[in-house]
Amino acid sequence: MKLSSILLALAALVSPAFSYAISHLPRSEGGLDIKLTAIGNTRIKAIITNKADRPLKLLRYNNFFDDAPTQKVEIFKDGNAVQFEGIYQHIYMTDLPDEDFISLTPGESIEREVDIATTADLTQGGAFTISSQGLIPFAEVDSNEVTGAMAFHANDLEMDVDGAVAATVEKAIKPVDKRSRLTNSCTGQRRTATVRAIQASAQLSQRSAQVAQNNAQKLQEYFKQTDQRTRQLVVNRFTAVARESTVNGGRTTYDCTDRMGHCQPRTIAYTLPAQNHITNCPIFYQMPLLTNRCHGQDQATTVLHEITHNPAIVQPHCVDHGYGYQAVRRLNAQQSLQNADTYSLFANGKMTFRLFLY
């Protein structure tokens, strides 16, 4: 069965009369303290402390609590960012189990260690600056539903790295096969699902570019500004994603199975930005192609989200400053422009209707 068209109820997106009603989000600044210290040539320790006057229940993905090779810090050399060589992962946020959260009582601290050379090339050696800031989604103590996001901004850490020693650290990610747009892992139903999701991402991105061009209220909701520069940056990125959403060209390669072994139980897909490579995880194939639920997750917006992470599409590429609608609403304007989930949530915001013709 071929997907011949996807129609998005588009008047609702273009008309400000149907704009999304913003609910008040919990105030969560200053409740989380993260202190970075050097404990080796390229190893650092993060001490995460609950400074709030109440218990915190923090989502463990895409931060220091996550054992996957996700971006936990930013690294700078002579003022320039060092390329991140790990993964950005897209997490399934529905029916989260208890084990997906880390609980901290008031005043409690947890320590985590990471070798930053596993996901960055530090062989040049010398002085590096390490920083970390962002938002961690949280749930209330008696619930597993994410209701807000906790902001954090760690101290800047200066490190003097021995490049020769850094070169001996094993990398978390190995080079991938670039000979094919869809690798030989893409066969049968998984190939069909992936191709359809890529096609749907193209149409969704094209329409989102039109909405960004014409709906100032929606642009303000997600990107915090409506000036011409902001509008053009958003339109350009959606247009680039639409252009890249193809199986006949482009620079992104796809794995339809997890050959590298980085899918966690809740991971929908993940991207290797340094290699412009996307891997679908088992949950991806259990999701609908497109959902009618506002800010719901589906295959098409997952592809859209992952493509924004690839630097071959638009530079600088998107990162994961905030995850989920609550976190996205807390980002400032500059963070919003560089946040992958802002684009996928914009694309399937309230009043989006999809009709399939086969």
Swiss-Prot record:
Gene3D superfamilies hit by this protein: 2.60.40.2970, Collagenase (Catalytic Domain)
Transmembrane portions of the chain: none
Keyword Metal-binding attached: yes
Catalyses which reaction(s): Preferential cleavage of bonds with hydrophobic residues in P1'. Also 3-Asn-|-Gln-4 and 8-Gly-|-Ser-9 bonds in insulin B chain
Domain of life: Eukaryota
CDD domains found in the cross-reference section: M35_deuterolysin_like
Molecular functions (GO terms): metal ion binding; metalloendopeptidase activity
Key words, A-Z: Cleavage on pair of basic residues, Disulfide bond, Hydrolase, Metal-binding, Metalloprotease, Protease, Secreted, Signal, Virulence, Zinc, Zymogen
E.C. numbers: 3.4.24.39
Cofactor binding note from Swiss-Prot or TrEMBL: Binds 1 zinc ion per subunit.
One GO biological process term: proteolysis
Obligatory cofactor(s): Zn(2+)
Coiled-coil ranges per UniProt: none
Pfam family, one: Peptidase_M35
GO cellular component annotations of the record: extracellular region
Major subcellular site: secreted
Designated name of the protein: Neutral protease 2 homolog MEP8
Organism: Coccidioides posadasii (strain C735)
